[in-house]
UniProtKB/Swiss-Prot annotation:
GO BP terms, alphabetized: proteolysis
A cellular-component GO term for this protein: extracellular region
Coiled coil: none
Residue numbers binding Zn(2+) 1: H167, D185, D251
Identification of the protein by name: Probable leucine aminopeptidase ARB_00576
Amino acid sequence: MKVLAALALSALAMAKPTPPMPGMSLVQTGPQETRWVTAKEKHDMVMNHIGFFDITNRPETASIASKPKSYAFPGNVSHQAEVKPLLEKISADHIKANLEKFSSYPNRYYDAQSGVESAQWVMEQAQAVVGNIQGAKVEMVKHDWMQPSIRAIIPGKSEKIVAVGAHQDSINGNNPQGEAPGADDNGSGSMTILEALTALVSDQKIAGGEAANTLEFHWYAGEEEGLLGSQDIFQQYSQEGKEVVAMLNQDMTGYGETMGVITDNSDPNLTKFTKMILDTYTSAKYSDSECGYACSDHASANKAGFPSAFVYEAVVGQDNPAIHSPDDTIEKLDPAKMAEHAKLVVGFAYELAFATL
């Protein structure tokens, strides 16, 4: 039956629909809602903060919405003695320094050379962090557009995956290849998870492959154009039968006072666990919030059948108003806020790395 299902999916994938006009994209804005849009209409959706999957190259996924597998996530933290020393290694100044470099590219657009160069820089930083760990690797994930996604893998005793992700691309909503420093959206999340990775691999058990589960850190390409990179990765994982037991998304981490714990298109059990991590390992205030359909990359994991959670910089509506413009600069951000998000990532990743799931 699995073979027949795979063949059916392959047949659907080959039978890609023809756009009404050249250059149009097929977008999905709800579980059963798809339509063709022009490039201008698509960028208007970006500017109006309308979430969507671009499924032009994956039309078969329009009707695929796998219910995430249910896991019994821990009800208590078990590794405070190991995690708290790692939190002391998180440096707001280091996050800021990395973000100054990352937001210095003219833009990080998914289909521009500067987006390729910024991805290469991320890969170099990740390689410097995990390069001496036996069995660990950092790799480019190539797509049908210029910018690759970047993936760092720190193996554990099993092939079950605990994933942390952030999109690396930026966009100018009025002119996609125009100036887009993207300091908050999403340089902040990208550098937050890089800092967390740096702290995590300083732990001898993590670096020694003693964790029960494998850790993966992802920097996605093409989020702004319809969650493109994360769709590719998680749909491929689903097709290959990989088991992602948890995914935490970090998209915008540098603005506002009260974090927003996103409760739609996410896994309620994993979200409950994430709140416990916030309470234990950070000093952050947070409130529940909703961001709508396909608002960020956790939705790609959720759609592919993997439990996901998303902690945002603020309650939706109280977030950074300068995104998708040349004004999304580092001066508007709080490095200490990003450091709190990094603490969340470290606690989340460490506790689940050693959890029996």
